[in-house]
């Protein structure tokens, strides 16, 4: 079983300027990471954290859909042990009734293709460090579509399949590939959802624990734990319940 302790390791987090991503940066520092590359399209909100940890936090501007920026960040971060693919987006809107392809394409570009670009760029880097780990922040909606977010669900389903494919392909280089499937988390993206929400910190804590134990599929909050339990009992019933949420 592949495992990895964060202490003295180098971590790169995408979408780290707020929410779950920022919690990953803070938790990695708390657990003794040697260095954290905190990346986002705008890293301004992390300036104080970087100033307080000048030897351990490196801020890098990154749009994961921009191949040139991905390549530049990979060139600047050749010492990474753990890649956390956290950057994501949701546009909402029904499929037929909305009749608007643009937000669905945006979701797929960021949540699937952007994640893939980062994995391709950093797989050789973590290999050179002994295998390392790639962590993909996905969603329970990638396991069964939610009718109020069909494009987001489809993009996260693609991310789920990508994670499985990466796990198989990178096993020979001893890279631990983890899929994380949160339910509603207390972030800006989920603020409109009428559910109890777990904290971003709890997601980061669960993921770093999973790295240490080699857990490949992480359900980091009570909602996601119960959701996957019901999915395993009766997937069709869950599908119908999710469809009623439109």
Describe these PLM feature segments.
Residues 119, 155:
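Active-site helix of classical SDR
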Residues 53-67:
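Rossmann-fold cofactor-recognition segment
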Residues 29-48:
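Conserved glycine-rich Rossmann-like NAD(P)H-binding loop of the short-chain dehydrogenase/reductase
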Residues 139:
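Residue(s) in the substrate-gating loop at a strand-loop-helix junction
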